[in-house]
């Protein structure tokens, strides 16, 4: 991901100085790259994951690590429901006129339909053709009804989280079915 970011959005020291005031503040807040980590709502329980990125881990993590209240507080539903709040999306859109890359992950981003309303707003504002969308997904869910929205963007890429093939992938990524991953 870092390679992708530095290749797509290179910024030199001169670029940084040009957009910065003498006191270190930005002259204007306009996002070129936005990463939307849409909470931890996920349909998979990967052995390499944790409750920060997968809601499927919350109950077991509670049993395994009962002494970690900081984790419990961090992953509580009240801290991860922000993707469902319209106020967040209304504030974000104000800074997206110069947006070039929108990186969307989760949990599993395709479980959070609210972000498609945001994409539609970018289309309605006439800025979608300059924006690349990049999804990080576990390849178990795709909603093809949104393809019409995606066509309005410069490009849509999918970074696929696959740890192995067949039964080994199903073992590592509990609740996945390999044939469904192949259908993605």
Stretches found by the model and what they are:
Residues 89, 119, 146-147, 182:
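Generic structural signal for well-ordered alpha-helices
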Residues 29-41, 52-84, 97-115, 125-144, ...:
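Core AdoMet radical
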Residues 1, 42, 46-49:
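Short cysteine clusters
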Residues 84-92:
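Alpha-helix-centered segments that form part of catalytic cores
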Residues 1-32, 52:
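Flexible, acidic/Gly-rich N-terminal and inter-domain linker regions that tether
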Residues 20, 92, 96-99:
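Generic hydrophobic, helix-prone segments enriched in Leu/Val/Ile
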């Amino acid at each position: 991901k870092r390679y992708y970011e530095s290749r797509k959005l290179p910024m030199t020291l001169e670029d940084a100085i040009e957009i910065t005031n003498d006191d270190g503040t930005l002259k204007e807040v306009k996002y070129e790259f936005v990463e939307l980590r849409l909470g931890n709502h996920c349909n998979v329980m990967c052995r390499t994951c944790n409750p920060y990125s997968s809601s499927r881990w919350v109950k077991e993590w509670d049993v395994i690590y009962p002494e970690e209240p900081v984790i419990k507080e961090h992953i509580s539903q009240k801290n991860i429901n922000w993707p469902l709040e319209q106020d967040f999306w209304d504030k974000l859109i104000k800074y997206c006129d110069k947006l070039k890359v929108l990186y969307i992950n989760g949990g599993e981003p395709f479980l959070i339909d609210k972000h498609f309303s945001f994409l539609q707003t970018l289309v309605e504002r006439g800025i979608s053709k300059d924006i690349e969308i990049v999804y990080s997904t576990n390849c178990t869910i795709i909603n093809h009804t949104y393809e019409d929205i995606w066509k309005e963007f410069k490009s849509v890429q999918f970074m696929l989280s696959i740890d192995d093939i067949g039964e080994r992938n199903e073992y590592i990524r509990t609740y996945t079915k390999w044939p469904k991953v192949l259908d993605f």
